[in-house]
A protein has these predicted regions:
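Metal-dependent enolase-superfamily TIM-barrel catalytic cores that perform enediolate-based chemistry
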Residues: 197-200, 204
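Phosphate/pyrophosphate-binding betaalpha-module
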Residues: 204-213, 227, 240, 244-259
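Mature N-terminal, pre-catalytic/accessory segment of carbohydrate-active enzymes
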Residues: 19-41
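Bacterial Sec-dependent N-terminal signal peptides
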Residues: 1-26
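Mature N-terminal segment immediately following signal peptide/propeptide cleavage
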Residues: 34-66, 71
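Short, well-ordered coil/turn segments that N-cap beta-strands
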Residues: 56-57, 83-85, 109-112, 163-164, ...
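Enzymes and membrane/adaptor proteins characterized by extended Gly/Ser/Thr/Asp/Glu-rich
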Residues: 64-194, 216, 221-235
Length: 260
């Protein structure tokens, strides 16, 4: 059964990938640092930076991937004037994101971190890319190995367009039907199942070479406020938080995952 499911998913993905790959311009490779030299390279870069440049490295600038002169001017200013450490592309066309990534990397003295908010893959933000089910559907899968393979496939697609960090997976436990913003973004209402899915998917991302970021700490599943518009409050005692909201995040920490 597992083999049949994987075959079905693979066929769907291949069909979609062939379509979007034909539209995608080549990615400008900046080079890959040798693992043993990474720390020395980072120390050397930091030693040559001004205070302004060091501060800029802490910021990720949001860009809409549209090939416009205004967008290019925006990227130019973010990199040359404010010395940002990375970019977050959100929405638009796949080909535009790749072209703007190449443009941005060509401007940067220090290679940029290119980030993405793709909880269920590239299609969450980019048109014409492979579509996967929402997390609520994936939370019903009993074989967590499939979630791991799914994470690796999302990582592969991210790397093809130069993305190194994916702000996923959602580790919130959806236990409030009045929640206006989480819902199907969550793997479900069982903390243990959510934790298992989060760890499997995030491990797949990271084994595929893309940093995962579990969110939204300390838990956004039992709120009735959209945090994009106001500040949610969790009015629960520590025992409740440990057993539900914090449980998936603790499991992610135990698993040694890279981001939160």
């Amino acid at each position: 059964m597992k083999r049949n499911v994987l075959l079905f998913i693979s066929l769907c993905v291949v069909g979609c990938v062939m379509t979007y790959a034909q539209q995608m311009p080549g990615l400008l490779q900046k080079g890959k640092a040798d693992t043993q030299d990474c720390k020395a390279w980072v120390d050397e870069q930091l030693s040559e930076m001004s205070l302004k440049e060091k501060i800029g490295q802490l910021f990720i600038h949001t860009v809409t991937p549209l090939q416009t002169q205004r967008n290019k001017n925006n990227i130019y200013a973010a990199i040359k004037e404010y010395k940002v450490g990375g970019l977050l592309f959100s929405g638009g066309q796949l080909s535009d994101q790749v072209l703007l990534t190449n443009y941005a990397q060509s401007l940067a003295e220090v290679p940029l971190l290119i980030t993405f908010d793709g909880e269920w893959g590239l299609a969450m933000r980019l048109k014409g890319t492979p579509r996967f089910p929402r997390n609520r559907v994936l939370g019903c899968i009993q074989d967590n190995e499939l979630l791991y393979e799914y994470g690796k496939e999302v990582a592969r697609q991210c790397k093809e367009i130069g993305v190194q960090i994916n702000f996923a997976p959602v580790a919130d436990v959806d236990v409030n039907p009045r929640n206006p913003v989480i819902n199907t973004r969550s793997f479900g209402g069982d903390p243990r199942n959510v934790a298992q899915k989060v760890v499997a998917y995030a491990r797949g991302l990271e084994d595929g070479g893309v940093l995962s970021v579990c969110k939204h700490f300390p838990g956004h599943g039992d709120t009735e406020v959209d945090s994009h518009k106001a500040l949610p409050v969790l009015n629960f005692d520590r025992a409740r938080l440990d057993s539900i909201e914090l449980f998936p995040f603790k499991e992610a920490v135990k698993a040694g995952l890279g981001g939160m």
